[in-house]
Amino acid sequence: MCDEFVLDNGVRVIAEYIPHFPSVSVGLWIGAGSMYETEEENGLSHFVEHMLFKSTQRRTTREIAVEMDAIGGQVNAFTAKECTCYYAKVIAEHLERAVDLLSDLLLGARLDEEDFEKERGVILEEIAMCEDTPEDLVYDLLAEAYFGDHSLSRPILGTHEQIASVSREALVAFRRKHYRPDNTVLAVAGQYDLGSLKEMAQRYLGAWRADGIPQEPVASEGCEGQYITRKKDIEQVHMCLAYPGVGQYDDDLYPMSVMNNLFGGGMSSRLFQRIREEMGAAYSVYS
């Protein structure tokens, strides 16, 4: 059974108490991912994620890195097509320190020009790393082929050209548009006291205010019969196939998940047994 409540500013809080866990995980989920970007904004969700781990009004970049290490905790973030998540895992007694740090990243980031330029270089290297990792690159090509001109077709990292030319002002504007209390979920799992959690949420997130309304992405049905190839000087060919599936609220979601597991979910799956075990044609195959 989960505890759920909403702050006056719209931040939603959902928590699950797990008594046999000595630790607690906490995440701030923002409805900002690459599917919410325009073509000119491509890569900004991920760029913002990087920038929020730079200096804040209360912490230096190093202090952010050291704070969780000092108590044996973990802190990190990721950007997806649908969202960006900032999360931490700590011993239960340090829950407030985790909420304090994550809320400081979210609300207190300085977004300095010097940090912006340094992080631009880091992300350009990350894009180059993806280009050198064909098992990652092939998924970007698959999305490009399947979704065509829709925002879902664009890479989460952005392109080299886009990141090399984007301005700090564009990043600040994107953050202002999408990082809003009514577009945020605070999720907690592990040991916590509900009354204390409500006080923490109000103390660290309750005063947050934002203006404007982010643009919602247009639904996409995908394309038909598209394919993309990219020639690389490597030893193997990496290939992906995509077909229309079902929505997350569709009654067929769970039957399809079971079917997917039978088809390519493990060593006993049909794909693995046929392509690897019987044919010896590939090392890795899955769905």
Language model features with spans:
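Charge-rich, well-structured scaffold segments of protease-associated domains
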Residues: 6, 17, 61-216, 229-230, ...
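A common structural microfeature
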Residues: 12, 23-25, 44, 48, ...
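Short proline/glycine- and acidic-rich turn/helix-capping motifs at secondary-structure junctions
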Residues: 216-225
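Histidine-centered active-site/metal-ligand motif
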Residues: 46, 50, 150, 238
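A generic structural signal for well-ordered coil/turn residues at beta-strand boundaries
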Residues: 1, 22-24, 82, 223-224, ...
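Active/ligand-binding-proximal structured segments within catalytic/core domains
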Residues: 17-68, 251-263, 271-275
